[in-house]
């Protein structure tokens, strides 16, 4: 039952917007749970959240044929402003069902599921004479989020009549220009083994690792995370500066990857000097370009994820399932593939299907010592073209770390 006439009308309005405009994303500036109340208005939104989300997803599933291409964001899912204080066991479930959004806060480490940070260029509502965040600060926040499995919502503060200051416009132009130059390290990029530090930020995509060097110099730069001993990095074959594809001299050793960027050059079209002279992105090619368990295109039903495992898993994360019937699905172009998973962490059976047909099973046996990055299945030769690969839990504990595509 609804909490108030206001909540009743709100529900109808949201339903009307979903059906009429078919949005890809709905943002709610309110808490998902019922133990925090925004602005002192007890309208019952927390108790309506399951109904709103279910309605949004069910309608979208019919429109997108079950591809789950929509997202809803709410606040107060765990963290400092947790709105599930009355039922904390719900946080883990809700975290997988929507994207949690928080003002001015970036998660401290890589997260298993996506999150959003909200930042404003100035105040949320225009203040005459107020100071602006720099383009450099916005890019720093953006890449910190992307590297930890998050995204950034940027509020461009407007005057009451809808226009923006020239300063705000230039900041947006600088941010947009930097993203345009380095977009392959941003759009659809996924977290690497580690997110980085105050000097370098990592992302990955399409078999490449990207390192954002915040303060480049002509002195050698050492990146320990990309050493020859890393569980997620193979033999590095090429390093290039993304903005001009210039080859960067490098040496990979057990201590790390040493780069010689040379004298920093100013990026064209950016007025913010710190951003124009710094924040250089390098593209790193290596021979361990596996498809990770959370790469774009993966569709799951019932599976859970762990990240920051620090146990030797590829990209330091893992997808796993404890429930029969759970499915992990992806469509890839491959003539042959191998499944990488830890052997020994649990006991269960996983069925492998290609284009809907049974091609084999993987048996996981509990062992005293877990062998990470084990090849647990290799397919026979497939016809040329794209194939749907599906992993189905038949019983017990099963997992996937990566797929090697041939």
Annotate the PLM regions.
Residues 1-286:
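Mature catalytic domains of secreted/periplasmic carbohydrate-active enzymes
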Residues 281-406:
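Glycan-recognition surfaces in beta-rich domains, encompassing non-catalytic CBMs
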């Amino acid at each position: 039952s609804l909490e108030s006439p206001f909540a009743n009308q709100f529900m109808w309005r949201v339903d009307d917007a979903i059906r009429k405009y078919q949005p890809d994303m709905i943002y709610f500036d309110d808490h998902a749970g019922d133990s925090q109340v925004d602005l002192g208005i007890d309208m019952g939104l927390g108790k309506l959240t399951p109904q709103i989300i279910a309605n949004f997803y069910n309608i979208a599933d019919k429109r997108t044929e079950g591809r789950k291409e929509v997202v809803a964001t709410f606040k107060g899912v765990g963290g400092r402003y947790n709105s599930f204080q009355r039922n904390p066991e719900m946080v883990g479930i809700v975290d997988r069902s929507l994207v949690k959004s928080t003002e001015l806060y970036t998660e401290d480490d890589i997260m298993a599921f996506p999150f959003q940070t909200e930042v404003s260029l100035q105040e949320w509502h225009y203040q005459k004479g107020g100071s602006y965040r720099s383009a450099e600060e916005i890019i720093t926040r953006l890449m910190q989020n992307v590297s930890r499995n998050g995204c950034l919502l940027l509020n461009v503060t407007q005057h009451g009549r809808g226009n923006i200051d020239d300063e705000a416009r230039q900041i947006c132009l600088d941010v947009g220009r930097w993203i345009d130059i380095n977009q392959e390290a941003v759009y659809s990029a996924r977290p690497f083994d580690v997110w980085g530090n105050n000097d370098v930020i990592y992302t990955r995509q399409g078999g490449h690792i990207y390192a954002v060097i915040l303060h480049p110099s002509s002195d050698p730069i050492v990146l320990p995370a990309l050493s020859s001993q890393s569980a997620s990095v193979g033999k590095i074959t090429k390093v290039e500066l993304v903005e001009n594809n210039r080859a960067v001299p490098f040496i990979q050793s057990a201590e790390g990857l040493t780069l010689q960027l040379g004298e920093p050059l100013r990026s064209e079209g950016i007025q913010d000097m710190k951003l124009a002279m710094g924040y250089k992105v390098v593209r790193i090619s290596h021979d361990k370009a596996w498809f990770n368990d959370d790469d774009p295109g993966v569709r799951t039903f019932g599976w859970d994820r762990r990240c920051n495992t620090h146990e030797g898993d590829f990209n330091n994360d893992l997808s796993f399932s404890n429930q029969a019937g759970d499915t992990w699905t992806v469509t890839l172009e491959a003539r042959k593939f191998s499944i990488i998973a830890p052997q020994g962490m649990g006991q269960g059976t996983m069925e492998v299907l290609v284009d809907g047909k049974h091609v084999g099973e993987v048996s996981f046996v509990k062992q005293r010592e877990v062998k990470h990055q084990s090849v647990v299945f290799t397919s026979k030769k497939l016809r040329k073209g794209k194939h749907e690969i599906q992993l189905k839990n038949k019983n017990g504990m099963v997992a996937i770390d990566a797929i090697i595509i041939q």
